[in-house]
Amino acid sequence: MQNTITAKHMKLYDEAFVTGCDHSQEWMLHWFIKNFKKHSSKPLIFANFGVTDLALNIMRENCHAIMDLTDVEEKGWFKKPRTMVNCPAKKTVWIDTDCEVLDNIDGIFDLLKPDMLNMVKDEPWTKRTGQTWHNSGVVGFIDKPIILHQWYRAVKTRPTVAQGDQEVLHSMLNPITKIKYINDLPNEYNVLRLQVETDGYAGAIKVMHWTGQKGKTKIRAML
């Protein structure tokens, strides 16, 4: 099932999910895979940001392909845009490893619009900052749109210790360019922990995103 992807030789998938992490987050992988496989029949690609051999073997057994990002200049979550730019799929959906898949998510590929990043609005951040934010825990796209390459370049040229990939993307866009480059996905594809715990969200949930340290505590309780 598994291939190790290199730049020179890769199979192109019509539709694929992709996730990735390093050794500090690998404890969630078995939990993530179990939930994902219950609710998706699509190929899953794993981006190795620097996991242990044990974790890598688990992902080799459960994924269609492995992307090796252990020897790149970006650190941590700044490897996400590089992964997305190089992911070998016509239609790609990135999903964070702290996302709990609770229902069939394969329909997300039918919602993707070309030339855009397809994301769920970050309702908690939007509510608390007064600006429109989108959460990068789930990001879909067709081919490799210009905005994805711009995001990747921005991460390479202006990362800061205080920011993550989501913050870099937000800093690139104004209200007008957001309309051009971001397509809103239904909230159910990325429901954030704060929505459920403090903001009274009562809608459908296909993907529950357990953000922050409190979210990781919730995940540990499920293991």
Model regions and ranges:
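Amphipathic alpha-helical segments that form well-ordered structural scaffolds
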Residues: 31, 35, 58, 83, ...
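GT-A fold catalytic core of metal-dependent nucleotide-sugar glycosyltransferases
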Residues: 68, 75-133, 140-141
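Short, solvent-exposed loop/turn segments at the edges of secondary structure
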Residues: 133-134, 203
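Catalytic core and acceptor-binding pocket of nucleotide-sugar-dependent glycosyltransferases
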Residues: 141-222
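N-terminal anchoring/stem segment of glycosyltransferases
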Residues: 1-73, 211-219, 223
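Short, polar loop motifs at secondary-structure junctions
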Residues: 48-55, 103-105, 123, 188-190, ...
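Aromatic-acidic/polar surface patches that form glycan- and anion
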Residues: 18-29, 77, 129, 158-162
